[in-house]
From Swiss-Prot:
Reaction catalysis annotation: uridine(34) in tRNA + AH2 + O2 = 5-hydroxyuridine(34) in tRNA + A + H2O
Family recorded in the similarity comment: Belongs to the TrhO family.
The organism of origin for this protein: Rhizobium leguminosarum bv. trifolii (strain WSM2304)
Entry protein name: tRNA uridine(34) hydroxylase
HAMAP family registered for this protein in UniProt: TrhO (MF_00469)
Top-level enzyme category: oxidoreductase
Length: 309
C-alpha cells in the first residue's frame, strides 16, 4: 500500500468485484444491508447470479467487518478488493441491489465464470501495451476517458457499457494485430469484455488485473504510462497516482467531471450547467436545477445534507 493510503484520511474506501456463480444471491441482500448500516458503511453493492460488484466506504473496522462477512460465504472466499482513502464520506447512503448482471453489457450467454482473458499484473502492463503487436482498448465510457487514459489506447467513446459490443463488431481492424489488451477502472468491465472478445473469436486477449486503480497504486509515477486522472464513481470524482484524491469536481447537471479551468467558464454555474452540457439543456432545465441548488444551500445552513448534493 502506498504512503498516500495512510490514516490521515478517516474513511477507508474498498472497491470490489468477484465473478462467481451465486445461486441464492437474494438471501444476502438484507444481511449485507443490515451489517453495513450497523458498521457505519455506505456505498453500493450489486448482487446477481454472476457475482458481486461495488464500492463501499466507512471506518476501517466497519469495512473489515463487511469484507470478513463476504469472505465467510463459500462463493466469495476468494474475493479481492482495492483500498484507497477519502477525506470525507464519499457516499450518501448504503444500497444493496439485486441485478440481472453485476456489470451490464446486455449480451446473452457471456459468462466470465467460464471463459475470460488472461490477467496481466500492473508491473507487467507497460511491456504489454508497448508491444507493437498489441491493440490497447479502454472499455470505459467517454466521460471517464476524457480526464485520463493510457498512452496509445483506443477510446470507443461509448456512453454506456452496452454500446461496447457494437463498437467491437463495427471495427474489423481490431483483428489486424494478434494481441488485445483491455482495461477499466477496477477490472470488472474489462474482465467481462474479455469474455465477450473471446466469444467473438479473438484469441490473445489480456486485461489489467485490478484495473487502473491497482496500477496507480502499485506503479511509480516516474514509470507510469498513464496520463491524467482516473474517474471514480463517488464524491472524490477522480484519483491520481498513488490513489491521491484528484482535483476534478462533478457537474451535478450532467454528471461530467470538470476541471478547475472549466469552473471559470462563463457557462459554468454550480449544480446548473457547465461547458459540457450548457447547449444540451433548456432554460426550464436550468430553472429546475437552480431550485435544487437552493434546496441544497438551505440544507447546508441547517447542517444537513441534501439528497441531491
Amino acid at each position: 500500500m502506498t504512503d498516500s493510503l495512510t490514516h490521515t484520511s478517516p474513511f477507508l474506501v474498498a472497491a470490489l468485484y468477484h465473478f462467481v456463480s451465486v445461486p441464492r444471491f437474494e438471501n444476502l441482500q438484507a444481511l449485507l444491508q443490515t451489517l453495513c448500516e450497523q458498521s457505519g458503511v455506505k456505498g453500493t453493492l450489486l448482487l446477481a447470479h454472476e457475482g458481486i460488484n461495488g464500492t463501499i466506504a466507512g471506518p476501517d473496522a466497519g469495512i473489515a467487518a463487511v469484507l470478513s462477512f463476504l469472505r465467510a460465504q463459500p462463493e466469495f472466499s476468494g474475493l479481492e478488493h482495492k483500498e484507497s482513502r477519502a477525506s470525507k464520506m464519499p457516499f450518501l447512503r448504503m444500497k444493496v441491489k439485486l441485478k440481472k448482471e453485476i456489470v451490464t453489457m446486455g449480451v446473452e450467454d457471456i459468462d466470465p465464470n467460464k471463459v475470460v482473458g488472461t490477467y496481466v499484473a500492473p508491473q507487467e502492463w507497460n511491456a504489454l501495451i508497448s508491444d507493437p503487436d498489441t491493440i490497447v482498448i479502454d472499455t470505459r465510457n467517454d466521460y471517464e476517458t476524457a480526464i485520463g487514459t493510457f498512452r496509445g489506447a483506443l477510446d470507443p467513446k461509448t456512453k454506456t457499457f452496452r454500446e461496447f459490443p457494437d463498437w467491437v463488431r463495427s471495427n474489423s481492424g481490431l483483428h489486424n494485430k494478434p494481441k488485445i489488451a483491455m482495461y477499466c477502472t477496477g477490472g470488472i468491465r474489462c474482465e467481462k469484455a474479455t469474455a465477450f472478445m473471446k466469444a467473438e473469436g479473438f484469441d490473445e486477449v489480456y486485461h489489467l488485473k485490478g484495473g487502473i486503480l491497482k496500477y496507480l497504486e502499485e506503479v511509480p509515477q516516474e514509470e507510469s504510462l498513464w496520463d491524467g486522472a482516473c474517474f471514480v464513481f463517488d464524491e472524490r470524482v477522480s484519483v491520481e497516482h498513488g490513489l491521491k484524491e484528484g482535483e476534478h469536481r462533478l457537474c451535478h447537471a450532467c454528471r461530467n467531471p470538470i476541471t478547475a479551468e472549466e469552473i471559470t467558464s462563463p457557462l459554468y454555474e454550480e449544480g446548473v450547467s457547465c461547458s459540457h452540457c450548457y447547449d444540451t439543456r433548456t432554460e426550464e432545465d436550468r430553472l429546475r436545477y437552480r431550485q435544487r441548488q437552493h434546496q441544497i444551500a438551505l440544507a447546508r445552513k441547517r447542517g444537513q445534507r441534501h439528497i441531491g448534493s
